[in-house]
Amino acid sequence: MIILLFFVDQIHQRDLNEIYQRVAAKLQQEDSLSHQKQRSDQFEKLKRGKTVLEGMLRFLSLSKSNIKPDLKDSMDYRKNNIMNFLNMQSLRKTVQKLQLTKSEIQPMQQPLSQTVQDQSHDDQTTLQMQSMSMQGAGSRVQQIRQGVLQSLEIGTPGISASPLLPELTSPDGNIINPLTSTCGKSSATELPIERLIRAMKSISPQALSSAVCDIRSVVSMVDRIAGSVPGKGSRASFGVDLVAMTKCHLQERNFMTQDGDHEKEASDNPNAIKCCFIGRKALVIATSILLVW
């Protein structure tokens, strides 16, 4: 027990000695400044505190054998005073550390908050740019769809909008390519015949029938514009060659102008007129047959 008390006294003496050194240095600094100015209250407080610390250190440095009998009753009181003083100093030091830590944290919080604000602003800007790009992409897709519909309705005469269009357009408005949606193979490595077979398998029979009818109507329309010739299929829709018929009409007109004088001479004879007309028609038919062959 005596060794433990001695060890505790040594710890208290070390703490008091450290406080005494700081107070003595502060008092010396105030004393050097007081030569130029009047002594302040701080100087007097430091001086009294130094005197108290010196008394505490002397009390702790006393040996048990040198303690007078009249001082033994006041030993507990003095030790309690020393303990209270050290506790107050420890509490003050803790408060100072907390204040210092708080003052260091506040400047760090300001750049952190500024960084968070900048990051949130950058995120908002990125979201706005993404929404704008998505809106632009949607408008471009809508323009492409409208252009395709207009080209089918206006640019291709004689063809109607077949049921292929709904199958190439999804319900949400996005354009779907049946060639790429039915198979993961890239269209760049596929043969045209493979893409055609896949497209034929992916559409319904009604859509395929409508597409075939549209193709037939276009081919028939082109043949009729260019002129048909005798034969089978769509090229024989008129039954005669338009070019040959035009030449026959021109030759018939020439014959009519040449036979004008003969008709005047035979105007009084009905049989002559009838024979002339039959002969001219026979000549036109014969010429047409020769041109066709």
Swiss-Prot record:
InterPro entries: MED15a/b/c-like
Transmembrane residue ranges: none
Swiss-Prot/TrEMBL keywords: Nucleus, Transcription, Transcription regulation
Subcellular localization(s) per the UniProt record: Nucleus
PANTHER family, A to Z: MEDIATOR OF RNA POLYMERASE II TRANSCRIPTION SUBUNIT 15A-RELATED (PTHR33137:SF4)
Self-association and partners: Component of the Mediator complex.
Function, in words: Component of the Mediator complex, a coactivator involved in the regulated transcription of nearly all RNA polymerase II-dependent genes. Mediator functions as a bridge to convey information from gene-specific regulatory proteins to the basal RNA polymerase II transcription machinery. The Mediator complex, having a compact conformation in its free form, is recruited to promoters by direct interactions with regulatory proteins and serves for the assembly of a functional preinitiation complex with RNA polymerase II and the general transcription factors.
Family: Belongs to the plant Mediator complex subunit 15 family.
Protein name: Probable mediator of RNA polymerase II transcription subunit 15b
